[in-house]
C-alpha cells in the first residue's frame, strides 16, 4: 500500500511485531487508537512479547497520562522508559537503534519514526493492523 501525507510518501507492507526479537512501543500513539488503552499493556504481558514501552513526558500536558501508563507498566511488570526531551516516536527509534538494531522494530502511528529510525524497522499501526513502513525516494516519479 502506498501512503502520501504531509510527512512524505511511504510504502507500507503487512507485518507483525512477532517477527521481531524486541519492539519499542510509542505508548501514547498506540494507546490512543484503542478503546481500552490498558489492553496494550495486558496483552503484551500475556503474550510475553519483548517490548520497551516509551512514554511521552516531554511536556507538562503529558504528565497525568504518563503517570497512568507508568502505573500500568509496573502492574504488568513491563519495561517502560520516559521520553523527557523529545517525542516518544523519535526516542523509541533512537533507543531501538542504540540497544537493538536490525531485527527489532518501533511500533507507532507516527510517520516521523520512519525518518528517525536507522537500522530498526518501523511498524505503523493503521486500520487495526501493523504495516512495515519505508519512505519512498522523493526523486522517483509517483
Summary of predicted features, one role per range:
Residues 1-19:
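Acidic, polar low-complexity linker/tail segments
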Amino acid at each position: 500500500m502506498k501512503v502520501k501525507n504531509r510527512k512524505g510518501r511511504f510504502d507500507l507492507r503487512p507485518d507483525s511485531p512477532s517477527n521481531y526479537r524486541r519492539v519499542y512501543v510509542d505508548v501514547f500513539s498506540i494507546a490512543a487508537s484503542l478503546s481500552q488503552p490498558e489492553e496494550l499493556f495486558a496483552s503484551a504481558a500475556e503474550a510475553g512479547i519483548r517490548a520497551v514501552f516509551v512514554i511521552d513526558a516531554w511536556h507538562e500536558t503529558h504528565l497525568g497520562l504518563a503517570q497512568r501508563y507508568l502505573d500500568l507498566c509496573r502492574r504488568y511488570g513491563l519495561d517502560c522508559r520516559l521520553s523527557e526531551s523529545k517525542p516518544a516516536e523519535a526516542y523509541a527509534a533512537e533507543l531501538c537503534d542504540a540497544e537493538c538494531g536490525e531485527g527489532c522494530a518501533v511500533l507507532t502511528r507516527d510517520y516521523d519514526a520512519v525518518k528517525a529510525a536507522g537500522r530498526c524497522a518501523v511498524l505503523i499501526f493503521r486500520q487495526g493492523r501493523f504495516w512495515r513502513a519505508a519512505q519512498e525516494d522523493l526523486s522517483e516519479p509517483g
